[in-house]
Amino acid sequence: MNWQANIHKLPALLQGRLKNDLARFQEALEQKNLDTVFKAKTLKTLCLVWGASEFVATNCIRWPSLLLDLQGSGNLFRAYEPNHYVKSLAQQLTNISTETELMVVLRRFRQREMVRIVWRDLAGWASLDEVFRELSQLAEACLNSALACLHYWQSQALGTPYGSISGKPQSMVVLGMGKLGARELNLSSDIDLIFAYPESGETRGAQRTLNNEEYFIRLARRLIRVLDERTEEGFVFRVDMRLRPDGDSGPLVASFNAMENYYQNQGRDWERYAMIKARVVAGDCQAGTRLMAMLRPFSYRRYLDFGAIESLRSMKAMIAQELRRQGIKANIKLGPGGIREVEFIGQSFQLIRGGRESALQERGILRVLTLLAERDHLPYYAKEELCAAYVFLRRVEHRLQAYRDEQTHDLPTSTEGRVRLAFAMGYRDWEAFASALEEHRRRVQEHFEQLFAAPHMDITDQMAQEKRLAEVWLGGELREASLAVLSAAGYRAPEEAVQTLMYLRQSYTVRALSAQARIRLDRLMPLLLGAVGRTEYPEQCLQRVIILLETVAQRTAYLALLAEYPMALSQLVKLCAASPLIARQLTRYPLLLDELLDPRSLYQVLGYDSLAEDLKWSLESIPGDDLEQQMELLRHFCQRQTLRVAAADVTGVLPLMKVGDHLTYLAEVILKKALELSWRHLVHRHGRLQSSTGEQPEESGFAVIGYGKLGGYELGYGSDLDLVFLHNAKPGDPPSEGKKPLDPVVFYSRLGQRLIHILQTSTPSGKLYEVDTRLRPSGVSGLLVSGLDAYRGYQCMQAWTWEHQALVRARFVAGDARLGAAFTAMRQEILGRQRDPIKLRDEVRHMRAKMRNQLDRSQGGWFDLKQGRGGIADIEFIVQYGVLAWAHAHPQLLEYPDNIRILEGFAQAGLLASEESQLLADAYRAYRAAANRLNLQTHEARVEEGQFRQERIAVQQLWSALLEDESAK
């Protein structure tokens, strides 16, 4: 063989050892009389691989047939199928009967496959993902094979363990933690394991009885020895059991109940972090699935756990302290900008959000980072930089460990070691490699510091004002001094602020706080007081924020959120200062505090399509049959999006007309999803209606008609939904197809009831909307769901004029589009009929007078924006009158259901002068804007009598001209 052809490609410093290794290999081949014909791919990469890995060279020299076998079988040149290791190992273990034989087979198998994996990695034939995957599959195959053999042999000798409750045979469950659990095992990694068994009990079938704990402890010790003990054949995998409950001082194996009790009552923050990657890797997988379901809530809390940041920061500080103590600086795993920092970034989001966003319950860090970017929790550029750095660092780690199959993460200090690592990484020299490494680590460190940098909460490090504010909160200042400090901080009535703080400090909630919660509250308060002092009305804002704090203080994660994220605190103060309605909403539903983290999304109001996509995406994480969780998520979604609209509204980002639009879009999206859930529920219980044309609500023969503010795109905060339900069932239509069939009319009635239930039922997260169905034919005495023909007949023959007025603002909003189109055509037919103008004017005037007498609260120097003379209702009645009076000659007036566009239509048709139309539209907008502002301040829609005087006079004049003057058009 001509080995010399490629030696010159190595750095000169590495060539001497390589020449020596090649000579020894040649000698070993000749001694064994082995064929020395190697494939071109093997020869081309041999010098590269051996130059970078003494481990590969040594094993090829010791077992010269190994390389020939790997290339002859083709295994060296291809990735394995997922079950290759299991099948191959099973064949080799067929005839063994002792632990000694098992240990020999496993070690030789491991050495052979490790040579193959390292070769493919260093040669550039395997991606990092392939290396991770195959190393993890190799470990699992060895674990499962060893456990199966040992369990069989031990049960033959000591009997089979049985559960005392189930009476069934018991098997051990092995959890893989860390890199093994995440399927990210490195080239010379320990495997972190936890052993468990389902139930307590005793063995059967042997002379001596053992309890299950003793049985499985013996089995665990044998398994560890078979894998971990170093013999002349080497080892299989080093086993680390320190992640088990109570670590080295805890039992080697624990029952499921003991595991659950430990993590519920004693589990520490770092154990939550470790459990993220836990996975069943060997033993009884079915029982293991139950165990993982029991343990999942320990890592993934149902609420947003912002305390995780503080815990991970503490863990990182402990690691850094230990590295300093040992004098280690160049550790690519634990050092600054290293592998662990990338993992901490991803896993911090998992700990915080994973309970709410089950899609984040992934183990692999690259997948987690990608999901975080997709969900806008992490900027895309940050994801790209972190993923690139992680891949680079893991490749460095593999090359460090490939050299001698040693578990090391320290960069070499010797010249030869540095030359070898740079060469193995594909760089011309150490300086070029070190520069690339430093750039990756710098980027990781920047992202890590941005997320984990401790906020300036240490009172001793605060500027003077915050120190003094802390003393005010803690009660360390005399009253006069406290008043002076608060006054200097911007408070106009510091006495009132002192009373508010005293109320909170002495409240039962604060006195009952845990030590950790009290520390977090004490850190937060000086920052909070400073931020509130900078608002326009600090005392008012402080009262609102204090009420919220008292509500959430027991959930320390929220205190951590506000303390850890200055932006969240800033937005909270800003919104509470602007609107008591928003403050009240945040207090009732603290989960919304998460929305304060990112002002970009907080003030970014979504359109209809984006809302629908966002809701669909959110519901994908919930099982389709879990209606309770679906209802909860709908409420969270509605509250979150309403908060965004309100935040954009009070800060002037969103104009008034857009507020109504977006609140209407939100209601429509929720209506459609609620109808879909209702339809699925009915179909599941009673089967699909044979008369419906498909599986979805859009083909159901059921339509939801929106009236009033929903129909007119004018929903406000807390608006009811005025709904009418229609169906297209015909007499004689067959019942539904299920085991509990329903007549179509009954089916549709149940569908309407279920929809109202989903929208209106109060849950721990509140309700979605109040639903008003009184505008249906015959009102509360009529059927909840009407057939389209019956509805048409009612509108033609029985409906009052006020019901036709209401029809002006009616439109199809959800359900069967064909039925919706039929309703739209019918609406145009009804509204487009010619009416007696005198009778119409009289009936509209009479209804308006009746409403005003009952509802107008214009008294005592106040004007009712809605019902007062010249107010909102007068404009709405003018619009409705105009449509009913003129649409027969101007059908274009029926195109839109909202007042502004109808007024524009009046002007375009010459029915009103442009100035008159504009005057009404401007007054309508001004009234609604004022009512909306008052709503945000939780005030009634009334203003001082002197406001809007010109607008009111103008509206009344137009009212008189159109509806009082007998010569009106």
Curated annotation (Swiss-Prot):
| Reported cofactor(s) | Mg(2+)
Tell me which GO cellular component terms the UniProt record holds: cytosol
Per UniProt, the keywords (alphabetical) are:
ATP-binding, Magnesium, Multifunctional enzyme, Nucleotide-binding, Nucleotidyltransferase, Transferase
Which region ranges are annotated with the description Adenylyl removase? 1-456
**Known EC number(s)?**
2.7.7.89, 2.7.7.42
Q: Could you state a single Gene Ontology molecular function term? A: ATP binding
Coiled-coil region(s): none
Some GO term, biological process aspect, for this entry: which one? Answer: regulation of glutamine family amino acid metabolic process
Catalysed reactions listed for this entry: [glutamine synthetase]-O(4)-(5'-adenylyl)-L-tyrosine + phosphate = [glutamine synthetase]-L-tyrosine + ADP; [glutamine synthetase]-L-tyrosine + ATP = [glutamine synthetase]-O(4)-(5'-adenylyl)-L-tyrosine + diphosphate
InterPro entries found in the cross-reference section: GlnE, GlnE_rpt_dom, NT_sf, PII_UdlTrfase/GS_AdlTrfase
Family, as annotated: Belongs to the GlnE family.
Kindly provide the name given to this protein in its UniProt entry: Bifunctional glutamine synthetase adenylyltransferase/adenylyl-removing enzyme
**What gene is it encoded by?**
glnE
